Amino acid sequence: MSVKGVEMPEMTWDLDVGNKWRRRKALSRIHRFWECRLRVWWLSDAGVRETDPPRPRRRPTWMTAVFHVICAVLLTLMIMAIGALIAYLRYYHQDSWRDMLHDLFCGCHYPEKCRRHHERQRRRRRAMDVPDPELGDPARRPLNGAMYYGSGCRFDTVEMVDETRPAPPALSSPETGDDSNDDAVAGGGAGGVTSPATRTTSPNALLPEWMDAVHVAVQAAVQATVQVSGPRENAVSPAT
């Protein structure tokens, strides 16, 4: 390319952009500004070839395959751990798992002062002016939030039985004087088999150690899967 008999190098793309802008009529200030920015920001094809030459495509090696397998295993374990934690909190702390998370992350451990503070907050939130005696003894009040906010789980009424502990003796009702439960407990103690209707356990007895938490969570997840996949007529009603 020659201009007035003088050999000039071939015009690159960024300079050609400026030449095209120059051919426009009545360029505004913003057009001139963007013309300048185009020259500064956008390299020509020759400049790109000089600064970033094409490299050959690297073929995956066995190290890449091992790395992908390790990443997949770690991701699977992380998802399983999150699911096990949710199952553990949901089925062993049915309504108190929110309080347990608060206990873990806030360090409150629910002393009497903190518990009453939460009760006052809930009462203010619900616009209720209920005196403390009507709520009952705070020391005997359960830590779960069933009395404050409902739960959406349809298996809240499922009784979790601890098979590793002996069942406590059932007391006869003082109104009717019915001792049928005592006979069932006595028969179960003599024969080594306890009736499922008389097996009761406290929520604190179902707290495993941290080493056994994963095993217990897997058992709870399997039990929940069996309950969900069972027939509809045998499903537990929340009203029972």
UniProtKB/Swiss-Prot annotation:
It is a single-pass membrane protein. The keyword Transmembrane helix applies. Residues 119-142, 164-199 are annotated as: Disordered. The chain crosses the membrane at residues 69-89. GO terms for cellular component: host cell membrane; membrane. It is found in: Host membrane. The keyword Ubl conjugation does not apply. It comes from the Viruses. Keywords: Host membrane, Host-virus interaction, Membrane, Transmembrane, Transmembrane helix. Interacts with host ATP1B1. Belongs to the HHV-5 UL136 protein family. This is Protein UL136. It comes from Human cytomegalovirus (strain Towne). The lineage of its organism: Viruses, Duplodnaviria, Heunggongvirae, Peploviricota, Herviviricetes.
